[in-house]
């Protein structure tokens, strides 16, 4: 068998094997995912029809108008009909793709129906983990999410460090979580089961392991789970701060109480840096630091007091939730500013030293070029 045939056979086998995989996007378990599945299939079929028509016309023109002996070359003339077709048809294609896409996208942003009481969950990304706070149930989980079937879930997406993207392929598309703000995303599971969720936006060496499990259960089972979760260890500020340290272990944890008792990440984006200092954690480049040295200075217990905050909105309004207003910790802010000023001065010294060194080298070179002054 020739090398070309072998490669062709291998390529064909790979294409056939790809059909054996379970593509989560096409295995929809919620209304949003079902709408997106329809859009994807609609767009693929629509574009395949266009490709088929174009290739067919291409083949016809090649054979019908190919060069023949003694044939005369045609002359180009103005043709209003053809010009109208090649301007109007692309516009109609864009409209046919845009209308269902825009309509579906706007439907995603609609709030839950009034007769359906939504479950509110704060999904917070930090340290290659996902924290899920249930403010009404007063529980919190890490890297695992439990939701009731057929009940809308209003996710309040936040990030405490890098920009990430919250994505549960079988329930709906991704949406970004960013520092200093809260993004809303409503999803519903219409089937029971366990689904996979992940961060779909690259954010560092732990990106591939920033995943979580989603358990869709009946309302009765959800109520039982909430009751059991309330009996777990209470989430203290010390415990939460330590959980903020970057880790790719992907452990699943459950606590009673939530971090929202002492911080709203959207209103206090610098909180995580103070948490690092409490446990003497210093961010290092993993490409130039041995794994055992990344956390060798981290303390088991905090070496600084917890950051004091004052919550003025503890009830978390359920629709259009306003962020909590946090009072600044003057002592911490002053320390942080002093450190920033110190680092800025150090950088200026280094920059000045580098400029002086370059000037000295240039002066020496000019001196040598002129024969050392002789």
Curated annotation (Swiss-Prot):
EC class name: oxidoreductase
Organism annotation: Staphylococcus epidermidis (strain ATCC 35984 / DSM 28319 / BCRC 17069 / CCUG 31568 / BM 3577 / RP62A)
InterPro entries, per database record: CcO_II, CcO_II-like_C, Cupredoxin, CuRO_UO_II, Cyt_c_oxidase_su2_TM_dom, Cyt_c_oxidase_su2_TM_sf, QoxA
Gene3D superfamilies: 1.10.287.90, Cupredoxins - blue copper proteins (2.60.40.420)
Enzyme nomenclature, EC number: 1.10.3.-
CDD domains: CuRO_UO_II (cd04212)
Superkingdom as given in the UniProt entry: Bacteria
GO biological process entries: ATP synthesis coupled electron transport
Keywords associated with the record: Cell membrane, Electron transport, Lipoprotein, Membrane, Oxidoreductase, Palmitate, Respiratory chain, Signal, Transmembrane, Transmembrane helix, Transport
Basic and acidic residues: compositionally biased ranges: 330-374
Topology relative to the membrane: Multi-pass membrane protein
Sequence intervals crossing the membrane: 43-63, 82-102
GO cellular component terms given for this protein: plasma membrane
Name of the molecule in the record: Probable quinol oxidase subunit 2
Signal peptide: 1-19
Record localization: Cell membrane
Function: Catalyzes quinol oxidation with the concomitant reduction of oxygen to water. Subunit II transfers the electrons from a quinol to the binuclear center of the catalytic subunit I.
Keyword Electron transport in annotation: yes
Catalytic activity from the UniProt record: 2 a quinol + O2 = 2 a quinone + 2 H2O
Main location: membrane
């Amino acid at each position: 068998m020739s090398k070309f045939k072998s490669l062709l056979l291998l390529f064909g086998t790979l294409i056939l094997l790809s059909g054996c995989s379970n593509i989560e996007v096409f295995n929809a378990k919620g209304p949003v995912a079902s709408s997106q599945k329809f859009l994807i299939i609609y767009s693929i079929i629509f574009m395949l029809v266009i490709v088929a028509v174009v290739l067919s016309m291409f083949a016809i023109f090649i054979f019908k108008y190919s060069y023949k002996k003694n044939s005369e070359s045609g002359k180009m003339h103005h043709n209003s009909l053809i010009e109208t077709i090649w301007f109007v048809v692309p516009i109609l294609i864009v409209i046919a793709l845009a209308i269902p896409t825009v309509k579906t996208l706007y439907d995603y942003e609609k709030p839950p129906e009034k007769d359906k009481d939504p479950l509110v969950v704060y999904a917070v990304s930090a340290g290659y983990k996902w924290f899920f706070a249930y403010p009404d149930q007063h529980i919190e989980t890490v890297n695992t999410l439990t939701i009731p079937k057929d009940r809308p879930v209003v996710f309040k997406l936040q990030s405490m460090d890098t920009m990430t993207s919250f994505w549960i392929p079988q329930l709906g598309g991704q949406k970004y979580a960013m520092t200093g703000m809260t993004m809303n995303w409503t999803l519903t599971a219409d089937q029971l089961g366990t689904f996979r969720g992940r961060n779909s936006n690259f954010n560092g060496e732990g990106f591939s392991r920033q995943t979580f499990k989603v358990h869709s259960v009946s309302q009765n089972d959800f109520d039982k789970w909430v009751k059991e979760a309330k009996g777990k260890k209470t989430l203290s500020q010390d415990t939460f701060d330590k959980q903020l340290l970057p880790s790719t272990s992907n452990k699943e944890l459950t606590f009673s109480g939530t971090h929202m008792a002492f911080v709203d990440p959207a209103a206090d984006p610098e909180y995580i840096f103070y948490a690092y200092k409490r446990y003497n954690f210093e961010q290092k480049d993993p490409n130039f630091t041995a794994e055992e040295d990344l956390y060798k200075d981290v303390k088991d217990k905090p070496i600084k007091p917890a950051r004091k905050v004052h919550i003025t909105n503890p009830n978390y309004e359920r629709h259009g939730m306003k962020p909590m207003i946090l009072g600044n910790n003057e002592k911490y802010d002053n320390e942080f500013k002093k450190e920033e000023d110190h680092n800025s001065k150090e950088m200026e010294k280094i920059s000045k030293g580098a400029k002086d060194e370059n000037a000295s080298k240039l002066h020496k070179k000019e001196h040598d070029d002129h024969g050392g002054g002789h």
